[in-house]
């Protein structure tokens, strides 16, 4: 059984995030989100991209970062989250090993 995947158009993404089309285009140009399709009229966004767009806009607004800096900040935030998950996994493994000895 296959899962149904829903996509949002550029119009739907701007309505749901209250972000202008120009801003979404700038975010896409920086690679912060990567919709399907070659041109804005063809773009299709996966639902999790809504949260990424909103996070990018908050960083841009609150920290007054340009879009390139926002892209870097989001990449670093994601890397820190991954490192924390890895650290937690390794701690659990170490705890199991300590119990065995």
Residue ranges, per PLM feature:
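Arg/Lys-rich, alpha-helical DNA-contact motif
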Residues: 2-6, 11, 15, 25, ...
């Amino acid at each position: 059984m296959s899962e149904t995947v829903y996509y949002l158009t550029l119009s739907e993404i701007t309505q749901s995030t209250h972000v202008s089309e120009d801003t979404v285009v700038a975010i896409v140009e920086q690679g912060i989100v990567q919709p399907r399709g070659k041109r804005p009229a063809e773009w299709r966004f996966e639902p999790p991209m809504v949260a990424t767009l909103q996070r990018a806009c908050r960083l841009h607004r609150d920290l007054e970062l340009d879009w390139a800096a926002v892209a870097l900040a989001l990449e670093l935030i994601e890397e820190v989250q991954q490192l924390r998950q890895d650290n937690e996994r390794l701690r659990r493994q170490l705890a199991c090993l300590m119990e065995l000895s």
